[in-house]
Amino acid sequence: MQIAIALVAAYLLGSVPFAMISSKLFGLADPRTYGSGNPGATNVLRSGNKKAALVTLIGDALKGWAAVFIAQRMGFSDNVIGLVALAVFLGHLYPIFLKFKGGKGVATAAGVLIALDPMLGLAVAGTWLFMAYAFRYSSLAAVVAAAMAPVISVLMHGGNGQTVVVGILGMALIGKHWQNIQRLMAGQESKIGSKKKA
């Protein structure tokens, strides 16, 4: 029963839509109505409000980190902690509070990885930052970082249970970016910092 409660709580925490909350706090339009339509930090940045985007980024990352950190402190096994990590991530992707239409999961995945293994999380975040700086496409950076995450995990820890969780997170994140991948291939993807479209 305790495990079930932990998983439900993690999912509900993941469902908290910080993009919506920060947009309301800063008097912005619903992020689902402009840009990519994605309720995430990159799309909120398209509103031109960097503070709102930062609040969204921190909030989304923090909920992923908090769910795993609390599960660790409660003494759950590694397998259960892995399930909690997946639950909070899926909560962000398919939030009950937004009719199961959530964000892409980049910030939440980063928070999860940092809680699971700080060095792994920082390595993956570093991959994202390098790609984002070099090419100015958040989606490309996310896809490359997601693909590299399980590879980095294998190099650091071998094919253990954590690597399986990281692999599932990576595949789900890439899947959520499928339309972005198509736009990248067509040369139609918006770059980081581009303003919202009317």
Swiss-Prot record:
Q: Which UniProt keywords apply?
A: Cell inner membrane, Cell membrane, Lipid biosynthesis, Lipid metabolism, Membrane, Phospholipid biosynthesis, Phospholipid metabolism, Transferase, Transmembrane, Transmembrane helix
Q: What GO MF annotations does this protein's record show?
A: acyl-phosphate glycerol-3-phosphate acyltransferase activity
**One Gene Ontology cellular component annotation held by this UniProt entry:** plasma membrane
- Answer whether the UniProt record assigns the keyword Hydrolase to this protein: no
Query: To which pathway does this protein belong?
Result: Lipid metabolism; phospholipid metabolism
Q: Which reaction does it catalyse?
A: an acyl phosphate + sn-glycerol 3-phosphate = a 1-acyl-sn-glycero-3-phosphate + phosphate
Which function does this protein serve? Catalyzes the transfer of an acyl group from acyl-phosphate (acyl-PO(4)) to glycerol-3-phosphate (G3P) to form lysophosphatidic acid (LPA). This enzyme utilizes acyl-phosphate as fatty acyl donor, but not acyl-CoA or acyl-ACP.
Question: Could you say which protein family the record assigns here?
Answer: Belongs to the PlsY family.
Q: What is this protein called?
A: Glycerol-3-phosphate acyltransferase
